[in-house]
Amino acid sequence: MGSEMCIRDRFIHVNHSIADAVAFAIKTPVGTVVMTGDFKIDTTAEDGMIDLARLGALGKEGVLALLCDSTNVERQGYTPSERTVAGSFERQFSGCNKRIIVTTFASNAFRLQSLITVAKKFGRKVAVTGRSMENILKVSTELGYLKIPAGTLVDINQIKQIPNNKLVIVSTGSQGENMSALYRLSLIHI
């Protein structure tokens, strides 16, 4: 039949909205295959910069195939750093004296941290809704990715007791999914 083939994996740190994202290089007898997964180049990322030196070294060694995925790769220019999002939140929060509702991917712990930090700065409580958002919040806090000041988080069931100008709701449903937390929020007119 065929002969055995030894494959050795090498993991390379990349930036993405998900913490600890990696690309990997598979060394085979016929050449190296690099799979990036979705990534962006962010020089100020919370979890460290993409390992361009390691990717460059692989390129110098020779790569048989590069399997690359990067959202908006066809657009010219650069993808802004996740840190720029906090500035956008600050601008929006500073001009708002009503309840703020924000949707985001539940898996983006860095964005959730930005929201929590800015909400605290503006004296607002944060309630999260959506099962995946609640799960990510719990796990990311346990793993140390999220630093949540005491007294900042409130249970979604307690939001009617908080003045609108002191509340931020972070919800799943940023892509308009039926039955997402955002969709359900819209049905009860909170």
Predicted segments with their positions:
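Conserved two-lobed SF2 helicase motor
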Residues: 168-171
